[in-house]
Amino acid sequence: IALIEEIQKLGFKAGDKTDLQNHYTLYSALDLDQYIDGAEKDAFVEALENAGKVLVDGDALEEDVVVADQKLLDAAEALVKKGDKTSLQKLVDSTADYKKENYLSAGWNTFEVALEAAKKVLADESATQEDVDKAKAVLTTAMTGLRYKADKSVLEEIIGKAKAMDLTGYSAENVALFNAAFAKAEAVMANEELSVYEQPIVDAAVLDLQNAMKALNDEKDNASKP
C-alpha cells in the first residue's frame, strides 16, 4: 500500500484488474487439447501465465494490467481450433464395404484419392475445421461420382456355354450368325467401362448370343427329325 501511495504521488496509477480478471477466468477454462499445438498455443499459455502474475501483483500499474489483458486477448484470438472430425469419420466409415471391382475405374480412381486424403486429415492432429470440411466435400463429390459396373454375370455364363459348342456340321449362315454374336459378347465382356446405366448393351449381347445358339440347336433338332 505504501508503495502504491508513493507511485501515485509520482503520477502513476494502479491498474483496475476487473477486465483482466474476467478474461483470465474465461480463458483459464479453455480445454487446450482442442487447439492445435504450435506457436499460437505457446503464446497463449505464456500470455495466460503473465496475466496470472499481474493479477497477484499488488504493485501492478494500469499500463501493466492493460498490456497483460491485451496480450491475453490477442493470444486467445490467435488460437487455432482443431477440426471436428466426427462427420468426416462417419463418411469414411460408410465406405468400408466399397469394392473396386464393382465400380468403373475412372470414378474409382478419383474416389480412392479422395478417401486417402480424408484418412490423412483424420490422422492429422493439426487439421483445422477448414481442412476437415474440404476433405469431406471432396470425398462426398467423389462418392457421388462413382458408377456401378454393369452386371455381366449372365453374359459370362452364356459365353462359357458358347465356347463349349462344336460348330461342325451347321449351316454357314447360322455359324456366321453365331460367330458375330459371340464376338460381340466377348467385346462387351471385355469392356470394363460399361456402367449400370449401360446394362441394356450387356443384355442385348446376351440376347443376341442366346438367339444364335438357339438357331444352331434348332438346326440340329430339325436335322435329326425323320
Model-derived regions, located:
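Beta-rich interaction/scaffold domains
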Residues: I1-P226
